[in-house]
Amino acid sequence: QGLPSFFAYLLGALALLVAFMYCYSRLTPHHEWALIRAGNAAAATAYGGSILGFTLPLYSAMAHSISYIDFILWGVVAFGVQIATFFGLKLFLRRQGESLSQHITEGHQAYGTLVGSISIAVGLINAASMTW
């Protein structure tokens, strides 16, 4: 029972992670992979922070869920929270007259760090919320 469960959770988590990375990079207005290949540290920092911000609650869901289906459902919640975090920050900055994607595309490291840090912070809060 132990080894099959291990592989089920591992493969489920990896599938959710790959799906998150793919969807996040498709939903954001800038093109993370192209920017990262070009050496854009702001894009790498923002994208890396969002990945960590997703995997923190994914870990919590894996550790605290009562079943595999419960884990997957909480993983989907974590997915949605991270996507909403990016778009919430984007909307907030737009109201300040700034384009988040433009700053990241232009390699402004401060904005990449801001996105990455907020993504991790929200991920930690999300993970703690899953410890019921």
Q: Which residue stretches match the model-derived regions?
A:
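Membrane-interface helix-loop junction between the first two transmembrane segments
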Residues: 19-38
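Interfacial loop-to-transmembrane junctions
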Residues: 95-119
